[in-house]
A protein has these predicted regions:
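Alpha/beta enzyme core
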Residues: 1-152, 158, 162, 166-169, ...
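Extended, intrinsically disordered, low-complexity segments
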Residues: 157-215
């Protein structure tokens, strides 16, 4: 699932974005109802567009997709400014124009997710990002109130960022990375994750075939 923010422009840009995502093999996107100059969903003073404008964004996305299985998630940031009831009303309007599911941003409690599922049977996404407004609910807690998809958007990034900071500070201090080797992923482990040897084998076969054809 790719975050396309507010769609990166008007209807034409949204259509182009969806086409590019499908061509790249993306399975799903989420598009939101903040104004174009948006901010982080867990920061104060967010501003949202009208229901009609968000519906136009969704219509452009839905009309542009060629693959029926391509999933378009409508994200709403309305909870902070309009409250749970208005946010749920908005979601109903988004689903009417073809959204496949709802991304309910910056929920404060499990009851808010439960309230949503009382109204709709469509898939519901919970964004469980660290250090934000939403508590770090467990997968079981979320499943029990009807959440279908859980997003951990920055979990690995935050760990990697802190690790990188510590590593480069260590190199500055010691002048070498040698003391850090035991906490690193080895070349062999990386190749295994990437299935690199299989790729290399295919590349060798391709070169061999090309050489045969040219000789």
């Amino acid at each position: 699932m790719v975050d396309i923010d507010t769609g990166w422009g008007g209807s034409e840009e949204i259509s182009n974005t969806i086409a590019e995502m499908e061509n790249a093999g993306v399975a799903a996107v989420h598009i939101e109802d903040q104004v174009y100059d948006k901010r982080c969903g867990h920061r104060p003073n967010k501003q949202i567009v009208s229901v009609a404008e968000m519906q136009d964004r969704l219509k452009a996305a839905v009309d542009a997709k060629k693959d029926e299985s391509f999933f378009i998630m409508a994200r709403t940031d309305a909870l902070a400014s309009e409250g749970i009831e208005k946010a749920i009303e908005r979601c109903g309007e988004y689903l009417k124009v073809g959204a496949d599911g709802i991304f309910f941003e910056a929920a404060l409690s499990l009851d808010e997710y439960k309230e949503f599922k009382k109204n709709f049977s469509f898939p519901l996404l919970a964004n469980i990002t660290e250090f934000g407004k939403t508590p770090l609910f467990t997968q079981k807690e979320l499943s029990d109130v009807g959440v279908d998809i859980v997003l951990y958007p920055l979990t690995a990034f935050r760990a990697m960022s802190l690790s990188a900071e510590k590593i480069y500070n260590s190199i500055i201090k010691d002048g070498t990375q040698e003391p850090l080797l035991d906490i690193m992923q080895t070349r062999e482990e990386l190749y295994e994750v990437l299935d690199y040897y299989n790729f290399e084998k295919q590349l060798d076969e391709q070169f061999e075939n090309n050489n045969k054809e040219s000789s």
